A protein has these predicted regions:
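Central mid-sequence intracellular linker of multi-pass
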Residues: 1-49, 237-263
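Extracytoplasmic gate region of multi-pass secondary transporters
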Residues: 60-118
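Interfacial helix-cap and linker-helix signal at transmembrane-aqueous boundaries
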Residues: 93-94, 124-125, 211-219
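Loop-to-transmembrane helix entry/capping segments in MFS-fold secondary transporters
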Residues: 100-101, 186-196
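Helix-to-loop junctions at the C-terminal end of transmembrane segments
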Residues: 118-129
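Structural signature of the two symmetry-related core transmembrane helices
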Residues: 132-146
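Intracellular juxtamembrane helix-capping segments at the cytosolic ends
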Residues: 171-184
Length: 276
């Protein structure tokens, strides 16, 4: 039901309008500028045919293939750890002899921790480098998933460490979403995000199956937790090799330079008028 609202009321990004320059692009850009309190521009920067022809499939081009593989792998691996907590906590707690309602209560604390983790992570990104913060968060996610697997059969202790595991694992998801948004250039960002998340969701399917298989083989919970926590560790290692992309100066900075030049010309013209 929100699709019509988005279609009619959410404007296209300035980057996209500058790159593609469809009919009425200048008017739409100036309308956005006015809403943000900026001066209008008189003309759009020149865009080469090669730039206009760039497609969403560029995420598989030689320039972006490494980025696509790294981000997709990191997300897939961390999702494996994240969904172990999300799907297996109630079963694990119930198998310890607690009532189903108590098992559900422990999972609630995982979600509470996750909500807090996402909020705190968002605040910290204002002060700490995004990639470094995400890597550290993934490592702590693995630590607390491992600790949860070794907690005694005590609801309070399990709830505490489950909340901490939820805190860091969900914060890691938030960090990966932010990295995905920065990893791809504007024209391929939507498709790149969809591809990475779609690929990574395979981890949400595989994670419960793998954990169940390990438990069925007779592996004890502490060992299973260690194995499932490895996903976050590997995700953190993979992220170390990522070089975040930035948009070409031909998009954002060129139109900003156009705007500044337009403002300067207006100021000069006003100065001449005053002198006369």
């Amino acid at each position: 039901c929100f699709i019509p609202v988005i279609y009619f009321f959410v404007p296209e990004s300035v980057h996209w309008l500058t790159r593609k320059q469809p009919t009425g692009a200048l008017g739409k850009i100036n309308k956005t500028f006015r809403r943000l309190g900026h001066s209008a521009v008189a003309a759009l920067p020149d865009v080469s045919p090669e730039v206009r022809k760039k497609s969403v499939g560029d995420i598989f081009s030689p320039r972006l293939m490494t980025t696509t593989l790294i981000v997709s792998s990191a997300y897939f691996l961390h999702i494996m750890t994240f969904y172990f907590i999300l799907k297996w906590v109630p079963k694990i707690v119930a198998d310890m002899g607690f009532a189903a309602s108590s098992a559900g209560g422990v999972l609630v604390w995982a979600n509470v921790g996750g909500a807090l983790g996402g909020a705190v992570f968002g605040f910290l990104t204002l002060k700490v480098d995004l990639k470094k913060l995400t890597i550290v968060t993934l490592v702590f996610s693995a630590v607390f998933v491992t600790v949860f697997g070794r907690t005694p059969a005590n609801l309070n202790i399990m709830s505490l460490f489950c909340a901490m595991a939820g805190f860091f694992s969900n914060a890691g998801i938030v960090g990966l979403y932010a990295i995905i948004a920065q990893a791809f250039p504007t024209h391929a960002r939507a498709f790149g995000t969809g591809f990475v998340i779609g690929f990574g969701r395979g981890g949400s399917v595989l994670s419960p199956i793998l954990a169940g298989f390990l438990l069925e083989m007779g592996m004890l919970l502490p060992s299973v937790a260690v194995v499932m926590a490895v996903g976050s560790v590997l995700g953190a290692i993979v992220l170390m090799f990522l070089k975040l992309q930035s948009d070409s100066p031909s998009e954002g900075s060129r139109i900003e330079n156009k705007r500044k030049a337009s403002v300067m010309k207006s100021s000069v013209a006003e100065g001449h008028s005053s002198a006369v």
